[in-house]
Amino acid sequence: MAGKVISVSSVKGGVGKTVTTLNLAGIYCELGKKVLIIDLDLFAGGIAVSLNIKNKKDIFMMIDSMANNRFTDLKDYVTTYNGNIDVLASPKDPREAMKVESRYIPLILDYAKKEYDVVLVDTSHILDEINLTIMDYSYMTLLITTNDMVDLKNMKSLVSIFKDTEKKNYLIMLNNSRDTGKDYMSLYDIRTIIGDNIDYTISRNYYIKNIDKYVMNGEILTLNKNINTFHQGDVNNMKKMALDLIDDKHKKEGR
């Protein structure tokens, strides 16, 4: 059975998109899933840095090999984090990032689905051709928003586009742990503003004060037993979200 592509996206930077991608990877890892994280935040990718991965290959090198008939195996371009999680890193050089063409994205995802149970794609917050292609080829897209008026207004615009194009394969997560001082809008107000439901909420209690320590150590939060115990409610919520994102029910719903 082919793996499922789950893209993680937003309409504003700094909303916790990369951390959420890594947390999902940790949950799938604990479930025994083989996971590939593809960093397609091409100009500001943070996956390899967050995991302390010293990658020698990246997605640009893979695409360059494809374009010049040198490509043979996806594994030649991924870097292993642990026994269940591999990473296809973003380019280190922004000049190379500019050369990544959207037409190669479906090919990369097809190769990845053959090798992995779950393919997590960390995107940028810019709705460009590459991100639109990723969403088109995703089994599900997780959209992340915060209690921020600019963020919510932009999310409203994206949701409107999805509805106009009859796109249904997405869930929306409200991340209250990112800016704990922002509580301007109630959940009802947020739903009204974006014109859609909030499927999952990460509470402000999940704010990790010493998160820099975990980043320095290259840790995934959901693989840390102490964090999982102390923040059990939010972790359980993320586990439910992770299972929902790969649930076969979306096929039955025409997603």
Where are these regions (language model features)?
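Phosphate-binding loop that captures ATP/GTP phosphates
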Residues: 28-87
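Acidic-aromatic/histidine active-site loop/patch
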Residues: 1-5, 160-165, 169-170, 215, ...
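Well-ordered beta-strand positions
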Residues: 118, 140, 196-200
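Cytosolic-facing regulatory segments adjacent to core modules
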Residues: 66-130
